[in-house]
Swiss-Prot record:
One of its GO terms (molecular function) is single-stranded RNA binding. Keywords: Cytoplasm. The keyword Ribonucleoprotein does not apply. Belongs to the YejK family. One of its GO terms (cellular component) is cytoplasm. It holds the Pfam family NA37. It comes from the Bacteria. NCBIfam families: PRK00378.1. It is found in: Cytoplasm, Nucleoid. This is Nucleoid-associated protein YejK.
Amino acid sequence: MSLDINQIALHQLIKRDEQNLELVLRDSLLEPTETVVEMVAELHRVYSAKNKAYGLFSEESELAQTLRLQRQGEEDFLAFSRAATGRLRDELAKYPFADGGFVLFCHYRYLAVEYLLVAVLSNLSSMRVNENLDINPTHYLDINHADIVARIDLTEWETNPESTRYLTFLKGRVGRKVADFFMDFLGASEGLNAKAQNRGLLQAVDDFTAEAQLDKAERQNVRQQVYSYCNEQLQAGEEIELESLSKELAGVSEVSFTKFAAEKGYELEESFPADRSTLRQLTKFAGSGGGLTINFDAMLLGERIFWDPATDTLTIKGTPPNLRDQLQRRTSGGN
């Protein structure tokens, strides 16, 4: 992985009681040793693979102001990180999920793009076997489950300040409160809505195939084509490019997909991140509620699966063998 650390700082927040988070600040930066580089590379990999929310700095953002000064050389990185950790403590203390942790600030470069990553990492206990085959306790950073993480694309921020996607953060397992916390700490407002962009793309694709008067099989083939392209972009860590997608759909209609989307006013960006859960709707129907979970390939609708909107009834012809076996055993047993 072509990742180069420029500067990295580590501090700690210790929860002493319900109201107080104690600051433990380092007096020096971390050295970018091989172990440190491996840790940052793993954090970068894990973070890049997760669904993120997008934002941009507000004009009053204190973090943005001090970061800009640091980038201009008016403040060193260690002082910036120490002051930011103090503000982080003040914001985090407002929320009941505040458990403290190790606060990481890392300025690094990956594939010619500069990033500032801010993360609160937890220390977990585990076991290890030593050279004498004794089992001893040990601790490790829980990078895979880190959910208090934000990253600023410094290159995008400085070269395209009007962008709405240079700042990203995770919403976390505890829901909106983590997102709210990061918005407050970063002094940011919500930017690009990737999920809305993906929903708009799906609607545009359906309308595009309808206007082209494709039959059912042809329309499903186009949906599969769109899904394959978008999924490839997702797996590669790349964004959906409308122009590239339009080339994939050349021949579907006399009008290009990009021209169709622009003329119909779908307000799609030229490129935007893929959202896995939304894109799945191109090839599958899924839903759950009231003790019922249903998931099936879209091509089965109208062939083996039929929906009557008047009665809201779903009819399935030919159940899966394992389900049929369970039903037969239950009914034959009289239970």
